[in-house]
Amino acid sequence: MKLAVVSVVVILGVLVAWPVSAGRKDLPGAGGYGGDDDDDTKSLFPLDNLLSLNYYDRICPDFEKIVVTKVREWTKSDSSLGPALLRLIFHDCGVTGCDASVLLDYEGTERRSPASKTLRGFELIDDIKSEMEKSCPGKVSCADILTSASRAATVQLGGPYWPNVYGRRDSKHSYARDVEKVPSGRRDVTALLETFQSYGLNVLDLVVLSGAHTIGKASCGTIQSRLYNYNATSGSDPSIDAKYADYLQRRCRWASETVDLDPVTPAVFDNQYYINLQKHMGVLSTDQELVKDPRTAPLVKTFAEQSPQIFRQQFAVSMAKLVNVGVLTGEDRVGEIRKVCSKSNSRAY
């Protein structure tokens, strides 16, 4: 069964216990923003009971311990892997749902799409899967591993913890043509909202999950059109602060180079991203569009002015929604528990 937004009733008590309500009252508006008339927590808990917080308690009790240990080991030697894992889960969930289709690696898959060429973290997921197969063979899906690893990476970066439910199955198929569903760095807010709403997410989730750009880097190739000869003007995008545009031009002479998405606190999971947007220092055009659009600008302003903890709390809620988009469950014949994350079982040998 494909579920647009799946969860379990048992999580309700956990989420309600989060200190989110204190931050919610500071968010502008209600309808459409996740206020009293649009309670996100209610949409998280349909009565299907197909995923569970304790899914692996008996069949693989060390599941989360293995994930956290491996993420810590890998990010210790390469700190850029933390943001990379967050980006990887976004790209997985944003195509056909959180089904690990992005991990399949053969001709014609999402992973082989030109739009996926800068994705990273695959080797870490493979390492975790290899360890799982030693501890509890055939029990843990790659989709659940990626979901758990993205949270472990977020926490490792100083971000929030959120409760994950498990029991996802892995997709047997992956198609490069589907990658166009992932929001690109050049879409306007209307297009972004249409995409998010198709996932069962709302405008608050859009602004909050965009805040993941408080860490990580952007490929200069994705922003050079904003820096050089913008709209055939021979100059840069006028929506970028002039001094910041000059800085980016000096850092992005070659498409292969990278630049911090947050130039102020690039290694800290905080609300600086929103402060930067208020100062016209958004690296991606989609980031800066959030300040210009009246549907999103009030939220950007709120997260910029409130305590960073408000952003962290809401990020946890929005991530708990995102990682349950379009999952495959135990009743799905189209899903499986892969033996190797990069290959469907029919291709594993």
UniProtKB/Swiss-Prot annotation:
Pfam families membership: peroxidase
Subcellular location: Secreted
Co-factor binding comment: Binds 1 heme b (iron(II)-protoporphyrin IX) group per subunit. Binds 2 calcium ions per subunit.
Residues of the site described as Transition state stabilizer: 87
Keyword Metal-binding recorded: yes
Signal peptide: 1-22
Binding site for Ca(2+) 1: 92, 95, 97, 99, 101
Glycan-modified residues: 231
Entries under InterPro entries matching the protein: Haem_peroxidase, Haem_peroxidase_sf, Peroxidase_pln, Peroxidases_AS, Peroxidases_heam-ligand_BS, Secretory_peroxidase
Record GO terms (molecular function): heme binding; lactoperoxidase activity; metal ion binding
GO cellular component, one term: extracellular region
Annotated positions binding heme b: 213
Keywords: Calcium, Disulfide bond, Glycoprotein, Heme, Hydrogen peroxide, Iron, Metal-binding, Oxidoreductase, Peroxidase, Secreted, Signal
Active site: 91
Membership in a protein family: Belongs to the peroxidase family. Classical plant (class III) peroxidase subfamily.
Function field: Removal of H(2)O(2), oxidation of toxic reductants, biosynthesis and degradation of lignin, suberization, auxin catabolism, response to environmental stresses such as wounding, pathogen attack and oxidative stress. These functions might be dependent on each isozyme/isoform in each plant tissue.
Protein name (database record): Peroxidase 7
Organism placement in taxonomy: Eukaryota, Viridiplantae, Streptophyta, Embryophyta, Tracheophyta
Gene: PER7
